[in-house]
Amino acid sequence: TFTITNPENYSGLYLPLAGEEGLKSSITPTLGGDSKTDQNHFLLEPVSIENLHNNRGTRNFWCRVEGKGYWSACGVSAEQEFDKYTDRQDESTLEAGMMWQKLTRTSKKYDLQSEITSFVSIDGTTEIQLIKITNLSEEEQEVTPIVAIPVYGRSADNIRDHRHVTSLLHRIDTKECGVEVTPVLSFD
């Protein structure tokens, strides 16, 4: 394993997550990247090294802190981007090993700490983020967790199709432990 302080300050840094059943993901210290089983089955939008760190449509976990605002546990809010490389930047640490990573982020402004551990399940069919939020304030805070992961749910061949139209051609069913995406029509 290895550890890096403020990993979001290193350009081009990303790691693999993979399982034995074919799920392959790339993940950055801010949870950017993609997830797929092959070139025809992407859960998240396909990315290249050029847009790996610039794509905003990716895994995210937000905390709405009553009376204070919104904080991204991944470090990608506009406020966090603005504070990067200043003394207001969140303290963050990336610890990683073979096919997993743990991102720890601390916000002085919001008095919160997040710990996000990312890996693929042993059976290799599910990408998992275990998220722990700790209140560092002396006082009780009302925090509402918000998960935001835009599902691409189609082939890399569809990357240039009109996104709104192709997303309308999906049937999405909410399940107890996630969502199921079924394309009903695709363009060739």
List each model region and its residues.
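Anionic coordination/interaction segments
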Residues: 1-188
